[in-house]
């Protein structure tokens, strides 16, 4: 079954109920939320989530396991001097996600900030992930493929697989972002060759969430600028291949394409992507 949705607002007064209603209004059957502003660590009490209302009204239409939580951008688990804060915050974030019954939390792997070689930053990330897993249960942390902007780590599949192998726990997996891997240099427009690459290198089985975005920039730009579907360099034909690929059935595919305060593309984009 295709699971297709988008990032939706998790905000007062209705929080979870409002987010899932927005998703259903867009024709989605999955969703992604931030449990607070993505730029900071401010969080409300779980008692304000309207979780019981969600259970009563919407849980039969979008199950908790089909709601993805995205960790905030400020968390850098690959920086040793900031890792204690990152671990403590992410443990609490996983616990908040557990309250809802979330299955997947997406995490940006971090930056080395020119403080360490890439390999050392990856090992710092491994250490942090192990500490988080020791203090949490159930939820799987999905490391997002990055565009390689600045000192971002994990802009290639090899590095993400290295981290996952070193952690050696089924609760660490991958979130594939189409804009990011395009900007990192992967030619996903040659979809069959790209898919073969994923299979041949044992990357396909690691993917548990997909962020489906077009890119404002050409391949290998390392810019990380999302575009609306078919309005960038990747184009609709390629992005539809991800949606209709049987290997990605039952994996939440999440749109993070640009929207404004007064306009959302998601209803139209979901309809367009689902069309055969």
UniProtKB/Swiss-Prot annotation:
Zn(2+) 3 binds at residues 180, 224, 226. Zn(2+) 2 binds at residues 144, 177, 211, 256. Pfam families: AP_endonuc_2. Its cofactor is Zn(2+). Keywords: DNA damage, DNA repair, Endonuclease, Hydrolase, Metal-binding, Nuclease, Zinc. InterPro entries: AP_endonuc_2, AP_endonuc_F2_Zn_BS, Xyl_isomerase-like_sf, Xyl_isomerase-like_TIM-brl. Its EC number is 3.1.21.2. Zn(2+) 1 binds at residues 70, 108, 144. SMART domains: AP2Ec. It catalyses: Endonucleolytic cleavage to 5'-phosphooligonucleotide end-products. GO terms for biological process: base-excision repair. One of its GO terms (molecular function) is deoxyribonuclease IV (phage-T4-induced) activity. Binds 3 Zn(2+) ions. Belongs to the AP endonuclease 2 family. Endonuclease IV plays a role in DNA repair. It cleaves phosphodiester bonds at apurinic or apyrimidinic (AP) sites, generating a 3'-hydroxyl group and a 5'-terminal sugar phosphate. NCBIfam families: nfo (TIGR00587), PRK01060.1-1 (NF002196). This is Probable endonuclease 4.
